[in-house]
Structure formats: structure tokens, C-alpha cells
Amino acid sequence: MGRLLDFYATQIRVLREWQGGPVSLLKRLVITLVVATLSFLATAAVLSSRMTVDRPRDAALAVFLMALFNAAIRPVVLVFAAQISLVLTGLLVLVLQVVAFLVVAQWAPGVHVDGFVVALVGSFIYAIINTVLTGILGVDSGGSYYGLLVQRLLVKSAKGHSDQPGLVIIQIDGLAHPILAGRIRAGSVNTLASWIREGTHKLSRWEAILPSMTSASQAGILHGNNDGIPAFRWYERDRKHLMASSNPADATLIVSRVSNGQGLLSNNGASICNLVTGDATRSYLTTAAIKAEGGGIGDSQAFRSFFFSPSGYLRSFTLFLGELFKEMYQARRTRRAGIRPQMHRGMKYAGMRAASNVLLRDVNTSLIIEEMYRGTNVIYADFTDYDELAHHCGPERVESFEALDGVDRAIATLAKATEEAPRPYKFVILSDHGQSLGETFKQRYGKSLGETILELMSGRATLVQTTTKAEGSTFVNAFLSEITSSQGVGPTVARAALKNKTTDGVVDLDADVEVPVSDPSAIAVVGSGNLGLVWFTGNDQRLTVEELEELHPGLVASVAAHPGVGLVMVRSKARGAVVFGPKGTRYLDQDRVEGEDPTELFGPHTVMSLMREDAMTHAPDLLLLSQYDPELGEVAAFEELIGSHGGLGGPQTEPFILHPIEWELDEEIPLGAPAIYRNLRRWLESIGIPLGAPKADARTTVAEETAPRAAVVV
């Protein structure tokens, strides 16, 4: 009984706080009652004679009675049912809604519901209409949903309060420093802007080096080491295998290579929606941990809370449909306006966008709140909303900015949730890289990079080419993989529906192509933004430029002379790493230039980045950067994404870090992701959170050095 009384007391207090005080709460209750009444009348109209309402005031009384029923009965039943079975919780939600409709039919004058089946259908129709109207009128932006989660977590939590702060690190995937600064000046991203203007946080910039993409950046940020990762995908000659950062088995291997046991999350930390783990104690939607035993969102109270709210899943489903139709409208508008650059945005992408902007954002936010109420030391979560939109629409288009505002609202929700958490939390917001705009290589020249190289070889090879998925699809796969590995009716249905897309328990909606290693003439061409990599898979060792000239005369010179190529790096047996450009050559090992320096256009860290790539064990036979227009900051991606990253040129190498004002960076502009690890580690130690013990065979991480090194050991 005491626990139940605590539940009601907490429910009332949190409800008041999450709705902005008594006046705001009263105003919202009145508006909610009006919207609910209209929804009830609309439901009766849809069901016609099988559900009737005599007068509008009868509908108002009915929804009021339903609200009382849900407030009084639902918590009593479900707060205990959720501890027993997720399936039981979900079923009880449906049953209670139907019972509420039947109770209303008995007690509310002027209301008639024709039996259980009509009540079942009516409860769904009512919830959908109410959710749509609420969303259109802006009555609730998620406050009730997250407020309910906070209520449940507070009742469940038995921990006392601690004054030692924890740390929440939010990664806004793909957001460049200059774009964030521009949105702040434009009056957008109000939460982040208020932190800066109130003097609690400082906006700083850091510099990403090759490859400027998520797996390399996250390995550097979370583990302090991103050696041996030449791109999002790469070919390993010794294993005759195409590595993919989005593949759970490959991501697990990456972590085993870069981790020394002292990841940022190694001391009671949580990884949410990431590629690598950071040696986290708990991981959710994390690619490298999908196949790990135990854990995952199926064991999460936040996931259970989704079923606890009668409108929770209907809210998400309705918002999902809304985002789907919104994308269809915006894509059509872009086509009609003739905006350039643009790309095809079909239904597959629309579904991916809706999943990223609705489902993943909700799940991420809920999981972070749950970990805060668990008292977790450090939480690192990746929001891919903006990155997904920027890839397909452009990093500075209205669709991308709307996604960014959505992430900003999620951060506001998290900041509010800390008020009831068992410990205070500091926030660091950062990005892993930026994005650069530009028509793709194929849009400009009619052929992909692989097709172009094959043509220059007169077709004397078998082409296998692959490009990087946007991060959003990777984490949708992670979400589906964890759902299908959970218990319950929903996961069972999902497993059956995704059977043909599932291998060893891992869902992949767009499986990668494996290089046919049996074909000695195969060339593997990988595009990662405007970074292109080429391997001649029939050779066990990296080919030198001399060997390439003997096997394929004139190929390197022809590739370097292509108008869509900015530079090509190869290895020379006599002169080391050599970079060819359209009007000159740079010998990296000799620090010598003939003609115009092809590296100069791409910035001051290009030589260091290329030397680092050249030293990697799995370096490609040919490494390319596309053409680059410094005036517009545009590149020509070797994949079909008009907003891209992975290479050099433009804001793709200009990520940001927004940190508490009292925490100083050890450099004005940190260079490389391991430098961010070094700063975050120092900040954690300053608030009494040391990292875990190193592995017995751990190597020194890059972050323990003063600068990124050229030599790379895998």
C-alpha cells in the first residue's frame, strides 16, 4: 500500500512539474478535455450506429470518466504487471482501454457502445484520432509520455540521492560547427543556444581527420584509439573479407582491436545507439554489442513504459505515419522546385527517415532517462536524426534543420528529467564529424567511381563496389535486431516478418555484398563520402605504383586526370607514398612537390591524414579524394548521398563540442577524435569518475600521445 501511495503522490507532483506549473497544467487539462471530446465524437461518427453519443456534453463526461478510470485503475494493475511480463503488460493495456469504453457505456448518460468488439475497435480509433489532433494542435510534444516514464522510474528506484555528478554525452551525428553556430544565430536550437547565452556552456570546434566518419570518430572518442580503420568499409587481404562498421561481427572485431579496457564507459557507463561500445557496462542499440549475451532494450524499463501508456505505441505509430507523409510532400516539393543538388528519395528512404526521427529518437531519449534514474556514471548516446536527413536532403536544408530542432527538444527533455534523478548530471553535446554538400560523382559524370575505373581498365576486371549506409539505417537494423531477440507477441511477429532479412539473430534490411574472393580479377571499390578506396583483390599484398603500371598501364595517371578526382594516393616501391593530382605530384615521405601540390586544396592536415592512411595495414591500392570546390565547400561523393562525409573538403571535418564552461579543452582546436577522448577522460576524473582497469595485454592508446601518429598497428 505504501508503494501505491508513493506512486500516486509522485504521479501528481511530476505531472505538475512536467506541465509547467498549476496554471499551465489547468490550461492543458482544459484543452486536452476539448480535444478528447472531439476525438470521442469523431470515433462515434466512424462507428456509426454501433457507437452513439446523444450530445457533445455526454461525450465530454465520457472522456472525463475514462480519464478517471485510467488514472485510478491502470497504475494499480500495470505497475505490478510490468514486473511480471512485457506481454502481460501490453495485453492489459488493450484490455483496460476496452474496459474503459464499456464502463463509460454503462455509466455515462447518452453514450452507447455495442459490445466488446466495438469497444476494442473504438478504443484504437479514439487513440489514433486523439493522437493526431493532439499533434496538429501542439497540445503535447511528448511531455506526458516522458513524464509517465519518469513517474514509473521514480517509484521503482530505491536509490538515495548523491551529490556526485554524472555525465551525459549526446552525439548529434553529422552536425558541423559552422552549421550549429548558424542555427543559433538564426534563433533555432533554443536549448543549446540558451546554455551558451546563459554562460553554462561553451561552443568549441575540433578537427576530424581521415576518415571523417562515425566508426573511426567513435572509436577515437570512446576508446582513445582509432588506428586501423581506413574507412567505414575496407577490404582485408589476409582474410579476404570486406569489413563493414555496420556489421555487428565486424564492429565487435573493431572494438577488440582498439580497446585497452579503459573506454569512456568502462566504469558503470551506458552506450546507446552507437557503433562501438566504449567498454560500456550496459549497451543498447549498439552495433558491436548486438550479439552479446543479456541486456538490450528488451530488458529496459523504458521499453516497457512504451507499453505501459495506452497511447504510447499509437502515438509513435501516428507520428511515424505523419513523418512518412511529411517526407513524401517535402520530396515532391524539392523535385518541383528543381533544387540542386537533390537525389531520389523513395518510400524506402521515407520509412527510414520516419524510423530515425520518431522511433529511434523516442527510444534514445527514454533509454537515457532510464540510465540517469539508474544513477549511471556516464552515458553516451548518438542521435542520427540530423545526419540521416542531411545525407539525403543536404546539411543546410529545411528538412535537416527540422530534425536538428527535434534533437534539441529531446535534449531539453533530458535536461528536465535530471531534476528528479538520483544524482546531478553534466551535459556534453558533440558531433563526430560534419557533412559537405555536393552533387555526387555519378550525378556529375554519369558513372560511379567503380564503373569509371573499370572503363579505364578496358573492362579487364570484375567489379564489386559498395557504398556506406547512412548511420540511420545501421541503427534501425540494431533496433530491429534487439526487438526480434526480445520475448513477447510483438517480437515474435517481428521475427516472422523479418525472417528473410535476419542472419544469426541480426537484422539487415540492406545487406552488404561480399567480395567474390575466388575471382582473381575482382576489384573492390568502396565509397565513403568523397573518400574512395580501391583494392585489387587477387593480390595478397598492396600493389605499388610500379606494379600497377605494369599490370594496368596508364591507369593511375588516367584516374588522377579525371575531372571528378582531386587526388590519388599510391605506394611507390622507390619513393614511398605518392600523391598524384591533375597538375602536380607530392611525395609524402620525401616532403617534395613537383608542379602544383594536390594536397594543398584540402587543408593543412591533409598530408598528415594521408600518411596515416598510407601506414595502415589494410591501406588500399588506390586512395582517392574527389574534386573539391573551396568557394562553395562542395565535394563529389563516391556514393549516392548529396550530403556526405568520410573524406576531406568542406565542413565534413569541422565537428563541434559543447561543454560546461568550467571545463577547458587542452587545445584551442583539438585534432583528431582521440584528443576528444583525452579531454573527456580528464573531465570525468575531475568529478571523481575514473575509468576501468586496463586489459592485461592493453597497448598504449593514441590519446595518451601528444598528437595523432602516422604509424598504425592493427
What function would you assign to each model-found segment?
Residues 358-359, 363, 371, 379, ...:
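A long, amphipathic alpha-helix that forms part
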Residues 142-144, 224-394, 526-536, 540-543, ...:
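His/Asp/Glu-rich, glycine-adjacent segments
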Residues 408-446, 577-580, 625:
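Metal-dependent active-site segment of extracytoplasmic phospho-/sulfohydrolases and closely related
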Residues 183-188, 289-293, 394-400, 437-453, ...:
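Short secondary-structure boundary/capping segments
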Residues 223-236, 296-303, 368, 401-412, ...:
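Acidic, His- and aromatic-enriched active-site or binding-groove loops in soluble protein domains
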Residues 2-117, 132-141:
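Juxtamembrane/disordered regions of integral membrane proteins
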